[in-house]
A protein has these predicted regions:
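Extended terminal and domain-junction accessory segments
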Residues: 3-126, 133, 179-183, 190-206
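Short, conserved phosphate/pyrophosphate- and ester-handling motifs at nucleotide-, phospho-/glycolipid
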Residues: 13, 142, 169
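His-enriched metal-coordination microenvironments in redox/metal-binding proteins
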Residues: 130-132, 142, 148
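C-terminal soluble interaction/assembly domains
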Residues: 136, 146-181, 185-187, 193-206
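Beta-strand signatures of extracellular beta-sandwich domains
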Residues: 138-140
């Protein structure tokens, strides 16, 4: 189910579907602000002949941190979630790393030294992303859609996603049905973290 409001957070690799209600004629800016910065960009929706005023590239205040307490995620509910089913396999996925040296890991290993997260095709899997670092990580799984089922130990019937944001020192559980037998990438979508090792594979066997 959707949220009503005028401001929504989004992590790297995520998407928003916006249903806008615009009254009458005029011009309406739809802006995106970068976390911790005054910089912003966006677009302007306008009816024919509307006056469009120039908007400064910098906002008045730094944009707030994104969903650091998972309050937005907690409000989200899937309109058509996964069928109810007991998990056949669970994996703890530990997210870690450091600024000095700048290295980011999954289950203590960088890409190339990783151990795959395994499943068999058709199994209901629960992945528990446990972030033990002081940076947030938008975790993305290729080839699958999962449903958020736990936030810091609290069971939820949450959103369906392919990228979920895991704030610092937090845990997010997601459930999915393992798809085609293949090696699917599982990684942080913050590119500097990905480039320094924060990737593993979700290995599905037949």
């Amino acid at each position: 189910a959707g949220l009503e409001g005028s401001r929504f957070g989004i992590a790297m690799g995520q998407r928003l579907d916006l249903d806008l209600e615009l009254a009458g004629e005029g011009a309406w800016p739809v802006l995106a602000s970068r976390e911790g910065s005054k910089e912003r960009t966006g677009l302007i929706l306008a009816t024919p002949g509307a006056t469009i005023e120039k908007i400064p590239a910098l906002g008045e205040a730094d944009a707030p941190a994104f969903d650091i307490d998972l309050s937005q995620e907690l409000k989200l509910r899937a309109s058509d979630g996964l069928p109810s089913r007991a998990p056949q396999r669970s994996h703890m996925v530990m997210l870690g790393g450091s600024m000095q040296p700048y290295v980011w890991t999954i289950n203590g290993a960088v890409w190339g030294q990783h151990r795959p997260v395994t499943a068999r095709r058709g199994e209901r899997i629960v992945l528990s992303f446990h972030n033990m670092s002081m940076m947030g990580h938008p975790m993305h799984l290729h080839g699958h859609v999962f449903q958020v089922v736990g936030l810091n130990g609290r069971a939820v019937t949450g959103a369906q996603r392919d990228t979920v944001y895991v704030p610092p020192m937090s845990m997010v559980d997601v459930a999915l049905d393992a798809g085609e037998a293949a090696r699917w990438m599982l990684h942080c979508h913050h590119m500097p973290h990905l480039e320094t090792g924060m990737m593993t594979e979700f290995a599905v066997s037949a």
